[in-house]
């Protein structure tokens, strides 16, 4: 057998050759060689080919489309005309769009003309020192790449248009809605002579979030003669439909990881996650999950600096962000979910990314796709995702770009263990967590539950958050797509209450038939349970006093109300019966008339006329009798 030829995966070995400044840029960014997806996609996209790229999470898709876009724009015969667009990159989320823009800006800092456009205008900055070097200038015909980020929620569409007219960017990056807003302006032009490339990143996510109509409208505004790249971690029927509409004879690139099976057959099987990522599961009761997570964090060497903990709902995040610091001491807990205002989301995301101390991002699926969080060591899934497709995207936050990572999914004993086989069928095999070896005792679980409850007792606001979060979690669990595995009827409510550190189980339909202790063996006087916030506590006490006064009045009028109610109900009942009787009578009469022949109906009309005539005669006689006052004396 002939020896295999070693492939040169350096960026300088790509064909067509990359510009020297691009090679310098990726080298400075720490990328020594191309990933498989970059090695396959960059040459094809730089040529005149549409590409459909299916690659595992964390495979370097972002540079795989940014490098070709920049190279193509900077190799044009003339610079892009003013207010003309050369390329558009569509992202499903604001966070992902922001990261794409950040990576592109880092790349363009190595191209002097483009880097000059990234700097703020002189009028937007304070007066500079005399020693500050002047801003470099370039001839009018100099080619450059100028990006603009378009995000809903942060600035208005009018501000986006103002920035576009001022800077005249030729690369637009944003979410579908805000991109479409800008493209509708008569001042924004995408003619065939200028427009070069369209990229749809995380295409399946774009469709899952309901952006199909916006995507079609964007595509309809672009010239058909263009290069199009569709990048995604998975393919679906909806994505295939988008490919048929938006791409012309695309080159399909599927980059998967090959892993040798552990069975005796020695088969080679495809994996949809990086080889550097270890995906494991731990079967443990609900109240043991947080203690187990604590032991995993303390057992790993070196200590994980960045970890992600996934929960199923926003309200769950709102609750656990307050109680987990009591248990996971030494870690910064950073919350991030879709209901946070845009400024809060950006602030918390940047706080986690820039953190230099051990941190845990507490989040929902808003961070499961596309977010390029560097150096994530560990991913926990306290709740398996409701959509199985999301599983690999959650796990894929760790083990990116060849870095070793660990993803641990917690499962309840019993039916939930079927989830393991469920994932294997979908080419996502997971193995039991053996390293580190974790053992949690009932005493460990009780100690953690006690700490959480102690924290919750300090402030009634946490009690409210716990109740709301638990109800939202139960509803999310009941809507799991793998409903045969995740069943409400199989839940141990006492275990769950202890796992959450609840002081009492909330009143909800799922617990109506449950015969257990909803107070969880805890004494709690809600009348004296106070809010830490003085204004909120004052309002609660006022409402409590008002309820007491209304309760006294209700007792005084209870008997009277009951008597009135009984008499009223009796009268209403009689009237209701009378109305019902009349309706039945009318219905029977209608049915009787409907069955008559024409002759019978004529006879009926004649009889009714005679009866009516007789009624009038009798009524007239009664009126005359009423006027008669007797004989005079």
Curated annotation (Swiss-Prot):
Q: Region Disordered: which residues?
A: 119-140, 547-633
Q: Where is the composition biased (Acidic residues)?
A: 119-131, 624-633
Gene3D superfamilies in UniProt: P-loop containing nucleotide triphosphate hydrolases
Q: Which UniProt keywords apply?
A: ATP-binding, Coiled coil, Helicase, Hydrolase, Nucleotide-binding, Nucleus, Ribosome biogenesis, RNA-binding, rRNA processing
Task: Please tell me one Gene Ontology term that the record gives under cellular component.
Answer: preribosome, large subunit precursor
User: Per its UniProt record, what Pfam families does this chain match?
Assistant: CTE_SPB4, CTT_SPB4, DEAD, Helicase_C
- Which amino acid positions bind ATP, per UniProt? 55-62
Does rRNA-binding show up as a keyword for this record?
Answer: no
Q: What does this protein do?
A: ATP-binding RNA helicase involved in the biogenesis of 60S ribosomal subunits. Binds 90S pre-ribosomal particles and dissociates from pre-60S ribosomal particles after processing of 27SB pre-rRNA. Required for the normal formation of 18S rRNA through the processing of pre-rRNAs at sites A0, A1 and A2, and the normal formation of 25S and 5.8S rRNAs through the processing of pre-rRNAs at sites C1 and C2.
- Entry comment, domain topic: The Q motif is unique to and characteristic of the DEAD box family of RNA helicases and controls ATP binding and hydrolysis.
> What name has this protein been given in UniProt?
ATP-dependent rRNA helicase SPB4
Query: Which source organism does the UniProt entry give?
Result: Phaeosphaeria nodorum (strain SN15 / ATCC MYA-4574 / FGSC 10173)
GN (gene name): SPB4
């Amino acid at each position: 057998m002939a020896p295999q030829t070693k492939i040169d995966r350096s960026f300088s070995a790509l064909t067509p050759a990359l510009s020297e400044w691009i090679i310098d840029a990726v080298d400075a960014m720490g990328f020594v060689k191309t990933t498989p997806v970059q090695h396959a996609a960059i040459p094809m996209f730089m040529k005149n080919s549409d590409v459909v790229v299916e690659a595992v999470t964390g495979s370097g898709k972002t540079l795989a489309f940014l490098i070709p876009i920049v190279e193509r724009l900077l190799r044009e015969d003339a610079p892009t005309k003013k207010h003309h667009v050369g390329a558009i990159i569509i992202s499903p989320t604001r966070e992902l769009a922001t990261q794409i823009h950040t990576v592109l800006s880092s790349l363009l800092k190595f191209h002097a003309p483009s880097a000059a456009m990234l700097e703020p205008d002189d009028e937007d900055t304070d007066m500079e020192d005399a020693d500050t070097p002047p801003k470099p200038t370039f001839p009018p015909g100099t080619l450059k790449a100028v990006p603009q980020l378009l995000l809903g929620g942060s600035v208005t569409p009018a501000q986006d248009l103002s920035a576009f007219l001022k800077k005249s960017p030729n690369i637009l990056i944003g979410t579908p809605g805000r991109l479409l807003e800008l493209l509708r302006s008569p001042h924004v032009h995408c003619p065939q002579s200028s427009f070069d490339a369209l990229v749809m990143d995380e295409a399946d996510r774009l469709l899952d979030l309901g952006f199909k109509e916006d995507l079609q409208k964007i595509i309809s505004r672009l010239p058909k003669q263009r290069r199009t790249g569709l990048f995604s971690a998975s393919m679906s029927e909806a994505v295939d439909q988008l490919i048929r509409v938006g791409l012309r004879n695309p080159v399909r690139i599927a980059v998967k990881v090959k892993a040798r099976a552990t069975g005796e057959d020695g088969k080679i099987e495809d994996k949809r996650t990086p080889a550097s990522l270890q995906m494991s599961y731990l079967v443990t009761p609900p109240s043991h999950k947080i203690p187990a997570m604590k032991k995993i964090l303390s057992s790993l060497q070196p200590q994980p600096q960045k970890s992600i903990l996934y929960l199923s709902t926003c309200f769950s995040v709102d609750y656990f962000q307050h109680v987990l610091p009591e248990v996971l001491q030494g870690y910064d807990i950073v919350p991030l979910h879709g209901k946070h205002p845009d400024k809060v989301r950006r602030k918390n995301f940047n706080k986690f990314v820039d953190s230099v101390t051990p941190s845990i991002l507490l989040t929902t699926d808003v961070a499961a796709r596309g977010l390029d969080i560097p150096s994530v060591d560990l991913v926990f899934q306290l709740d398996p995702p409701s959509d199985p497709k999301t599983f690999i995207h959650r796990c894929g936050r760790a083990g990116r770009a060849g870095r070793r990572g660990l993803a641990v999914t917690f499962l309840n004993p019993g039916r939930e263990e079927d989830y393991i086989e469920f994932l294997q069928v979908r080419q996502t095999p997971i193995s039991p967590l053996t390293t580190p070896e974790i053992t949690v005792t009932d005493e460990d679980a009780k100690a953690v539950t006690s700490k959480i409850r102690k924290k919750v007792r300090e402030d009634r606001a946490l009690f409210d958050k716990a109740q709301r979060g638990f109800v939202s979690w139960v509803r999310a669990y009941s809507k799991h797509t793998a409903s045969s595995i995740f069943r409400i009827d199989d839940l141990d409510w006492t275990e769950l209450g202890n796992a959450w550190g609840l002081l009492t189980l909330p009143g909800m339909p799922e617990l109506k038939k449950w015969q257990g202790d909803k107070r969880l063996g805890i004494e709690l006087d809600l009348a004296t349970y106070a809010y830490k916030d003085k204004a909120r506590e004052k309002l609660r006490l006022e409402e409590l006093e008002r309820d007491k006064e209304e309760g006294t009045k209700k007792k005084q009028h209870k008997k009277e109300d009951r008597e009135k109610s009984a008499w009223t109900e009796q009268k209403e009942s009689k009237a209701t019966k009378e109305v019902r009787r009349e309706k039945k009578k009318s219905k029977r009469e209608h049915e009787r008339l409907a069955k008559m022949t024409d002759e019978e109906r004529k006879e009926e009309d004649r009889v009714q006329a005679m009866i009516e005539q007789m009624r009038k005669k009798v009524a007239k006689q009664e009126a005359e009798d009423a006027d008669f006052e007797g004989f005079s004396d």
